[in-house]
Regions:
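Canonical Radical SAM [4Fe-4S] cluster-binding loop centered on the CxxxCxxC motif
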Residues: 1-42, 52-54
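Short, solvent-exposed loop/turn segments at secondary-structure junctions
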Residues: 15, 96, 140-141, 182, ...
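Short loop/turn segments at strand-loop or loop-helix junctions that form parts
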Residues: 11, 23-24, 136-141, 209-212
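Radical SAM enzyme [4Fe-4S]-AdoMet core and its adjacent flexible, acidic
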Residues: 31-34, 144-162, 166-278
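Conserved strand-to-loop "acid loop" that flanks and positions the catalytic carboxylate
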Residues: 63
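Radical SAM enzyme core and accessory elements
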Residues: 277-310
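Radical SAM/AdoMet-radical enzyme domain recognition
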Residues: 43-60, 70-184, 189
């Protein structure tokens, strides 16, 4: 059995965004432990399993927003020093990082409440501890689109994406832009081309495009209804895949159907966030919760390998 990614769930359900399609709400919060102390015994077992299964990438993510728990992120990075994972990534909506960027470039001193507890000291420390990549979740590169989805108002104070990217690059991070494709945002080949051009202009190392999806079993009818309304049809997804294949050079096929292309020097990955392929026995992601629970799927509660402390 091979495992592609070792995912670590940081924090609680708390989040500083208002995504109407929240995947965590749809997959549910029942898996989250009530206590936030890390089960070191099971973490060691999970890391050993991932290492022996050939995992090269650790992804710190959350059912909420992981950067609201910077000390917990730091703790996991210290724990990972004992394991030979070469690629360590953090998935985030980027709001707190963007606010730090705005403060930095405007030369305005803000207290930690502005960035909700996150500081430049945290980011530099994470980089020193081996965090390679910041994966920024967005619905595109238009500020009003991101503001409407993540903050609930197109006129809300969403940090300029270009400034966030520049700030993270300045620290030394690799940046991946993770675009959730949807109607009203990036939903056509033309919008995909515009997004690729933005990434090239701002030297974004990696671009991942995923269609908005809902899980087979949902815990949030409202979020699922939003996905039904704004999600792309199969014809739209096909057209985007064909367009990228036409202008790009295929580089590699990843587990569960993801395809990586070079498009005039820009790395572009076409993926699907909830794809399941049990046929080959490989695991797309090994998921560790702080209470020690270890699973291999976000949607299905039966995909459990280790139970956590009750």
């Amino acid at each position: 059995v091979k495992i592609q990614t070792f995912s670590i769930v940081v924090g609680t359900r708390a989040c500083n965004a208002k995504c109407p399609f929240c995947v965590s709400k749809m997959t549910g919060f029942e898996e989250l432990p009530k206590e936030r102390s890390i089960n070191l015994r099971n973490f060691k077992k999970a890391a050993m399993l991932a290492d022996r299964a050939g995992t090269t990438t650790v992804l710190m993510t959350g059912k909420g927003e992981p950067t609201l728990y910077p000390d917990e992120v730091s703790h996991y990075l210290y724990l990972l020093q004992d394991y030979p994972f070469p690629l360590i990534e953090l998935q985030t909506n980027g709001l707190s990082m963007g606010r730090l960027a705005v403060s930095h470039y405007m030369g305005v001193e803000k207290d930690n409440n502005w960035s909700q507890g996150l500081s430049a000291v945290h980011l530099n420390n994470w980089h020193t501890l081996g965090l390679n990549t910041i994966a920024l979740s967005v619905v595109g590169t238009v500020q009003q689109h991101n503001a409407k989805v993540y903050l609930g108002d197109p006129d809300a104070d969403y940090p300029p994406l270009a400034a966030t990217i520049r700030y993270l690059h300045q620290i030394g991070f690799t940046v991946r832009l993770c675009v959730m494709m949807m109607n009203g945002g990036v939903g056509s080949p033309n919008w995909v081309r515009r997004t690729i051009e933005f990434c090239r202009e701002h030297r974004v190392e990696q671009l991942t495009l995923r269609p908005l999806r809902r899980p087979h079993q949902t815990s949030s009818p409202d979020a699922s209804a939003y996905v039904n309304r704004y999600g792309l049809g199969q014809d739209q997804i096909r057209d985007i895949r064909l367009a990228v294949a036409e202008i790009g050079t295929p580089l590699i096929s990843l587990m569960h159907g993801a395809e990586v292309y070079d498009v005039d020097g820009q790395n572009v990955c076409l993926s699907d966030c909830l794809t399941i392929d049990p046929s080959n026995g490989d695991i797309r992601t090994l998921i560790f919760y702080s209470n020690g629970r270890l699973t291999h799927d976000w949607q299905y509660k039966g995909a459990v390998l280790l139970g956590g402390q009750q």
